[in-house]
């Protein structure tokens, strides 16, 4: 999704959000990520003014007061954390671990296939379909990518074929390389 993202070319407009919209977004984030409650004031302070950067391909970036990209979404999908945020606060998103053989493919933006989640070295945390997940790697401490489960973990174990996680944002893509938006 962010493979060819460049902040100068890809961002079409930036809007300041009204306080009622800010409260709604905070409530949605806390509903989607209950473990985030103790850190939400560090990430998105109540008195801070948030902005939304509208990008090409129906992507929206949620910016905090400093201009850091903290969450993004595609169309009306769920808000997903950026990898920079996940590296600071790693435990509020469900984690799925891929084996060593899948690392280079995930780092090039490929979707995670079911065999990469069920082989020895991989580890799955039980989760439902359409759950936002952090994609971890065997032997690494930080997340490689952020994605959305296309099947529940039980279906992945039973089927073991096809795409298990659709990758949205990965290390060294355009969003990772972009600087804070002023």
From Swiss-Prot:
GO biological process: formation of translation preinitiation complex; regulation of translation; translation reinitiation
Predominant location: cytoplasm
Residue ranges of every copy of the PUA domain listed in the record: 93-172
Superkingdom, natural source: Eukaryota
Compartments where located: Cytoplasm
Record keywords, A-Z: Cytoplasm, Translation regulation
UniProt-listed CDD domains: MCT1_N, PUA_MCTS-1-like
The protein's name: Malignant T-cell-amplified sequence 1 homolog
Job of this protein: Regulates translation as part of a complex with DENR. Specifically required for translational re-initiation in mRNAs containing upstream open reading frames (uORFs). Not required for standard translational initiation. Regulates expression of a subset of gene products including mbc, InR and EcR.
A GO CC term assigned to this protein in UniProt: protein-containing complex
Quaternary context: Interacts with DENR.
PANTHER family assigned to the protein according to its UniProt record, in alphabetical order: MALIGNANT T-CELL-AMPLIFIED SEQUENCE 1, MCT-1 PROTEIN
Name of the gene encoding the protein in the UniProt record: MCTS1
